[in-house]
């Protein structure tokens, strides 16, 4: 049995999912449970049961996943799970990423793009006050792309439902295929 045979790559791209990091240790934090969920009691539980398959494309991203996990952990960012607020749609000429969280203000959100890693980083910083005590929380959601992005033309908009980021591809998918015309050979004499 493979270490990574617990998911089906057609339905759950484990290593390619957007990850969420916090700058403070969450309650009941257990870094050993990388695939986590919430059982309604504030406790982390595994979302994945046993399964079959050995997805090769996921293995290609496996090393990046663990490298990012430890790189961020060493810099004071704690992996708190996969960010289900981030939704990605791939079109032939662009990626559209939406971060669904209501009532965000532009000063709470920062959108960065790492050109070297081809990675979008959405940072949300929120401050709350309760009983005279102020608390600041920062979450980082990271999303890597397989195809190169034209980073000079990236745009982001914020609305009532959250943030929408448009990332144009360097080459549209249909531009990768070139049609070669076929001519009829001249008849030999």
Swiss-Prot record:
Which InterPro entries does this chain map to? A-crystallin/Hsp20_dom, HSP20-like_chaperone
What role does it play?
Heat shock protein required for pathogenicity. Mediates thermotolerance and adaptation to oxidative stress and ethanol-induced stress. Required for invasive growth and filament formation under various filament inducing conditions. Plays a role in the capacity of damaging human-derived endothelial and oral epithelial cells during infection. Potentiates resistance to antifungal drugs, as well as resistance to killing by human neutrophils. Plays a major role in trehalose homeostasis in response to elevated temperatures.
Q: What induces it?
A: Only expressed in stationary phase. Expression is increased in the absence of adenylyl cyclase and in biofilms.
Protein name as it appears in the record: Small heat shock protein 21
User: Which Pfam family, giving just one, matches this sequence?
Assistant: HSP20
Q: Where is this region: Disordered?
A: 26-53
User: In which family does this protein belong, per the annotation?
Assistant: Belongs to the small heat shock protein (HSP20) family.
Stretches assigned to the sHSP domain: 77-183
Q: What is the lineage of its organism?
A: Eukaryota, Fungi, Dikarya, Ascomycota, Saccharomycotina
**Disulfide bond positions:** none
Coiled-coil intervals: none
The portions of this protein that span the membrane are none
Q: Which UniProt keywords apply?
A: Stress response, Virulence
**Gene Ontology CC terms:** cell surface
> Is the tRNA processing keyword given for this protein?
no
A single Gene Ontology biological process assigned to it is: filamentous growth of a population of unicellular organisms
Q: What is the originating organism of this protein?
A: Candida albicans (strain SC5314 / ATCC MYA-2876)
């Amino acid at each position: 049995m493979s270490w990574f045979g617990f998911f089906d790559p057609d339905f759950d791209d484990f290593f390619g999912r957007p990850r969420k990091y916090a700058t403070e240790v969450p309650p009941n934090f257990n870094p050993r449970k990388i695939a986590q969920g919430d059982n309604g009691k504030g406790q982390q539980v595994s979302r994945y049961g046993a399964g079959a398959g050995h997805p090769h494309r996921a293995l290609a991203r496996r090393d990046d996943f663990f490298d990012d996990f430890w790189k961020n952990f060493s810099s004071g960012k704690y992996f708190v799970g996969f960010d289900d607020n981030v939704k990605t749609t791939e079109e032939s000429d662009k990626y559209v990423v939406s971060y669904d969280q209501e009532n965000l203000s532009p000063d709470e959100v920062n959108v960065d793009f790492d050109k070297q890693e081809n990675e979008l980083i959405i940072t949300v910083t929120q401050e709350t006050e309760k009983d005279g005590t102020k608390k600041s929380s920062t979450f980082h959601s990271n999303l890597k792309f397989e195809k190169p992005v034209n980073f000079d033309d990236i745009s982001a908009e914020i609305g009532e439902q959250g943030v929408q980021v448009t990332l144009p591809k360097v080459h549209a998918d249909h531009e990768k295929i070139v049609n070669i015309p076929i001519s009829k050979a001249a008849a030999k004499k």
